[in-house]
Amino acid sequence: MTGLGVRSSSYGSLEKTGLNGVVLPIQITTTTRTKPSKMQKDREGIVHWICKFAGRKKVGMLLLFLISAVVFLRVLYVGKGEDSQEGQGPPSLHFNGSSGVNYSNMLQTNEELNMNIGNISFKAKEVIVFPPPPIHFLGYSLPQGHPCNSFTLPPPPADRKRTGPRPCPVCYLPVEEAVALMPNAPSFSPVLKNLTYIYEEPLNRETEFGGSDFGGYPTLKHRNDSFDIKETMSVHCGFVKGPQPGRNTGFDIDEADLLEMKQCRGIVVASAVFDAFDDVKAPQNISKYAEETVCFYMFVDEETESILKRERGLDGNKKVGIWRVVVVHNLPYSDGRRNGKVPKLLVHRMFPNARYSLWIDGKLELVVDPYQILERFLWRKNATFAISRHYKRFDVLVEAEANKAAGKYDNASIDFQVDFYKNEGLTPYSVAKLPITSDVPEGCVILREHVPISNLFTCLWFNEVDRFTSRDQISFSTVRDKIAAKTNWTVSMFLDCERRNFVVQRYHRAEQERFARQRPPVPNFPPPPPSPPPPVLISSDLPRKMSSGRATPPRRRGRDRRSGQRGHRKANLPVRLPDSA
């Protein structure tokens, strides 16, 4: 066998015998068909067996099913592996010089697998568990059969001597029921969720027209942008000189008063008297619970403070009745009417933690409990802003002419404001605006909830008053309609006679003094001396003694004389005797 190759067990390869019996491997590439292994024969037999009992179509469907199952299991396995390796880099493939891939570094031990499963479940909890949605007040209805559900206004009394506006009945709930119905959650604010306020340092005074150092000088572009309602907004809203209202911003308030105002977290009743224009009027019919829980704040200037000290005994406790008197320094305007617009429209900035506010002008006297008022006109209506409409006028154009006729403001300024609104689309009021019942409010009373959308409304309303005239009745409908065009929010307007039910209008201080001067003084005469005793016979009913000695009967009055004559005529009637029959 010298010179012949020895067949080895390497599936047909030959070994070359070298010198000294050393066998050298010879790598020969052959094209001859190798003998199939036993395992391969078994697989081929299974395939032939399947093909024998099933047709080609069924075999194809079976293979397609198997391939789909393999792909599905593979995707499931890969997806699970990605979840378990979240937060880590992608696994790298390591080659150690062999023809295969080493997956040993990619396999996980049981401990690692359990740890990853725990992490996966924890992360799944984080994804599934969301914070609860904000809870909003959705309104309520009084129980069926409640008297207020069927309450209707009676017709006005027919009094020709009194033709002006007058109060009408209102169906209030008892104080205890009104307190129980106070909402525990804020009302929904459409579109607007976050509202912040602009302050400028230094102050930019460049604008087209209008504005002030207190309210800022927003341009017309800023004005238009403020009516584009978004989820988050930042607008001018007074106090532009600093981030804290009342601290070196104009309309400055003592620090002790500011701290007390921050503690008001429920209802605040606010009013103001500047330039000693009115007397401070004590609220009436206020429940003990309201006195303890409602904040009553009266804002005055230094002139009014001096009068209160002299006439009402205002001292260090800063109280006049249930009013807490707050003295305002560094007033931003020379016109007292403009200064009064600050607490009237920006009360939410001065009381940042209050939920509800009731504003009444200084000329008014509150005569109904605040809880009853808010329940009737705000909570029961599911409204966030309520104001009474004017008792007579519904059209802004008519209201502007009435202001000009009464000399309420400079006529040229009123005309300029009305023309500006007309160019923006202001039209006379008509039934086409229903359910809006009026374009002219009676702004001496404002009921509101401090939510973002109502706060925005009063901010933009104040900006109009700051830019144009101080007659807020003229700018009210423009601001309301611009906000309503972007949201489904609007203002609730109730009857003027209903407003007159819970506030009583008094005369201004100057009018009271004028009436006092016109009233004639009462003469201070000494008391008259006592009258002498009457004579014995002075009555005309007693018989009078005549000179002849005869007594004449007393003179009869007209009625007695007529009755006597009737009796005499009856006596002269003929009498029919029985014999004459």
Swiss-Prot record:
Mutant phenotype after disruption: Strong reduction of seed mucilage accumulation and major decrease in rhamnogalacturonan I (RG I), associated with reduced absolute levels of rhamnose (Rha), arabinose (Ara) and galacturonic acid (GalA) but increased absolute abundance of minor sugars (e.g. galactose (Gal), xylose (Xyl), glucose (Glc) and mannose (Man)). The double mutant muci70-1 gaut11-3 is completely defective in seed mucilage production and exhibits a strong release of minor sugars in total mucilage extracts.
Sugar attachment sites: N96, N102, N119, N194, N224, N285, N382, N411, N488
GO MF annotation, one: glycosyltransferase activity
Region ranges (Disordered): 514-581
Lumenal-facing ranges: 80-581
Membrane topology (UniProt): Single-pass type II membrane protein
Entry protein name: Probable hexosyltransferase MUCI70
Lineage: Eukaryota, Viridiplantae, Streptophyta, Embryophyta, Tracheophyta
